[in-house]
């Protein structure tokens, strides 16, 4: 029986960007739909000169392991009942499932004057912005020394602890980087595919997923990479509870909802897409 996909719920953000939402999504059906839509947009641009709105797909996947173009079978450490799908995105092996926010970027890069490097940096910095805002909003002594950062040597977003505020004793030189922080793990992954200047695939942020699924693989090809989720650093609740006008969390309301995080990230990406948030200097090596 062929894989089928539910209808996507569509919402326009502006004339050049729309969102589409999908829950309990089958990976193969979603990939087929992304590729089909991308090829359709390429054809419309080449044959008719039409610029179609870019699309940000907000997806909640059923459990699946995916092998990117650089993926190696040896990075799958255990065989489970979870499907393993070979795909055409960049990167190696990862897991998708419930409690993880996946956003697919179906963008015409030429129309927004982005290079592939620009897109990757915008993706990482958007995640940094929103995760750091959420970490700060908790005002917790357990998380006020934690920050989200990208790395030049390994795509994605990672959490770092500021050792200077965590302990009075001086850490040894082999424990930390020169800026007095230590990486504690990875919270977000990314992998894109570019076809004739159009992107698809995208980013995945661990919000309140079951991290044990990562134990069966070397995430993104890195043996022993510690995967993290936001729910272990802030109070999260999946119940819909978006505050009016998407206001930041206040001191007396420290519970973050899945929907709040999603909306903040959509807003940040939309502003970057419109040119309203410039890129910062790239992360140090």
UniProtKB/Swiss-Prot annotation:
Residues bound to substrate: 89-96, 189-191, 202-204
A GO-annotated cellular component: cytoplasm
Cross-referenced SUPFAM superfamilies: Class II aaRS and biotin synthetases
Catalytic activity line of the entry: octanoyl-[ACP] + L-lysyl-[protein] = N(6)-octanoyl-L-lysyl-[protein] + holo-[ACP] + H(+)
Domain BPL/LPL catalytic: 50-277
Transferase is among the record's keywords: yes
A molecular function GO annotation: lipoyl(octanoyl) transferase activity
Keyword terms: Acyltransferase, Cytoplasm, Transferase
InterPro entries: aa-tRNA-synth_II/BPL/LPL, BPL_LPL_catalytic, Octanoyltransferase, Octanoyltransferase_CS
Subcellular localization(s) per the UniProt record: Cytoplasm
E.C. no: 2.3.1.181
UniProt-listed Gene3D superfamilies: Bira Bifunctional Protein, Domain 2
Active site positions, chain numbering: 220 (acyl-thioester intermediate)
HAMAP family recorded: LipB
This protein's name: Octanoyltransferase
